[in-house]
Every structure is written in structure tokens, then in C-alpha cells.
Amino acid sequence: MSTEERPPLGKFGKRSLEKYVFPYLDSSNATMTTPRFGSDYNAVALDDEKVLVVSTDPLAISPQLGWERSGRLALQVITTDVAVSGIAPNYLVANWNLPPTTSDETFEKIWRGFTEEARCSEVQIAGGHTGRYEGSSFPTIGAGTAFGVGKKEDLVPQTPSPGDEIFLLNHLGLEASAIFSFYFPERLSDGTSPSIVAEVKQLFDDLRPTSDLCYLSSLPGVRALHDIAEGGLLGGVQETLASEQGQCGARIVRDSVKVDDRVARICSFLDLDPLKITSIGSGIALVSPDRVNEFIRLVEDKDLPVEEIGEVTASNEISIENEDGTETLTGPIRDEFWARLSEFKGNP
């Protein structure tokens, strides 16, 4: 297979999932949700009242981030996908396929960060597997699965409807900016300033997205909730609306999407659009218009950085209102972060 024919890296897109994955699945009566593109989790009925929510993600560990910090981030990536369901993550299992040269002491540092973050998120590690294997290499060295058990009535409906207001739990662009700051501190300090790089690193270390998303999922009027990862905000909006099979669209007002000044400086230096890059710690909430005031009051009581950025529409298009006109999304969002990171690694 030539380089030109190589499949894209990252998550399977909608077409690949629907053609090569979903046709082979057999959903039982106990499965409350059908696997679909854009879904953060799936739910299984345990009885008439209780539900089990599950989600699996890769375990990604980056030496440049620091072993303990990478462990903390890996835990957050896994648990946030359950947190958006309305059921808090309770348990987790992890499969670590370590590179052959990974020492016990190195893994202990990763594990320390992972387990400390689990305690902060009130998640118990129920089991797993740990070993060294030929062919394994950083960053992707396994996978983790989070479980949450709760009442069916607490599940977020995940049913967007025209007129719903779109709110952003706003740490937009922070993950990508922080990763560059840890990987290339000197180059970013030269392009911005040493204080900006240091402050963005600290902002990233202070993130606690699992508890924030659990809180948002419990609020009245929340009709859908989605964490923002690959594809950024705009990719997240696409995934959030995917359940409606083209029956809903969205209008996003770019000027309403506030980006931290320090993050914006780094994104500008890197020529990255904060709306199109991975942003662990951020989330999208769709709120019924008749509950918006109550939602805002409760968010303000918690002092969360949440902003209204648009609304769900009856069209099947996602439009972004910019200063110089309106842009309509015509296809999947290509996360610009990964390409830029590869460029920087290739041009030290």
C-alpha cells in the first residue's frame, strides 16, 4: 500500500464504522443504546431501574508530558466519556501493553498519576492487565474501559431538538496548546513568551473534567452532552448531532466562542484554529430553551466557565457565523493538531 493510499490515522469515520463495523454487531434487548458514530458511551439495562454505562478509549502516554501527568490525562480521557451520560463513572479496568524497554520504575510513575486521578474522580480500578510486548510503542500502549452504574432516569436523553441552546464548557484549545508547551517549551517561549507557556501548562494541570461534566449532566434541561476530543468543538458538534440522522443542524457564532488569551496566543503562533483541535476538558451541552435560565444559574453557582455559543436548527447543516460571513461545514473535521505536531517533530 502506497503512502497516498494509507488510511487516515485516528478514530474511524462515520462511513468506515457503518460499512465495516456496525453490520457485524448483534444488539440484545438489554442494550438500551445502539452503537453509532459520535457516541461517547453505550448503556445496558441491568433491570427495570438500573443501567450500566460503558466506554472504552486508548491509553495514550507521552514521555514528553511527564509520566505522572500522562497517567492523569489517560484517566481523564477514559472517564469523561461516561461522565457525559448522566451516570458517574464508578469503576475502570485498564490493559497496559508496555514497550519492551519500559522499566518497572517508569510504569510506577505512570500508574501513580493514573491512580491518583482515579481517586480524585472517585473511580475505583477494578482490574486490568499489565505487560511488556514487542511492537508496542508510545504513545498508544493499551486501552481502558470505564463503567458507571445508576438509575435509568438519570441518563441524559441525547436527543437534540431544534431550538436547543448550545453551551460550551470552555477550556477550548487548552489540551493542544499545553501539549505543544510541554513538547517544545523553548520554541513556544520564543514565539509567545515564557510566562504564557508556564501558565498554559498550569491551566492544563488544574483541569478536572470528569467532575465538571458529571455536574453538567445532572442539570435540568440538558438534552445532550458531549466531551470535546479529536476534531475539536466543530467535530464535537457534528458528533453530538449525529444521533438525529441529519434531521438537526446547528448555528455557531464564532465571536461567542471565547478562547483564553494565552491559549489564543499559542494557537496563533502555531496557526491552529481553536475550534478544530482536540480539547480534552471541554464539553458541549445542548439545553432546552425553557430551562436555559435555570441551567445558567446553576452553572454560575458552581463557577464553571460555560458560555452560550449558538443553537440547534431544523436544517441539516452546521454553519459558523464569522466576521466576514457564514461558513458551512461540508464534511468531517480534520483535526489540525496532529499534522502540526508531526511538522514540529520533523523540524526541530
PLM region spans:
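Helix-biased detector of long, well-ordered alpha-helical tracts
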Residues: 1-348
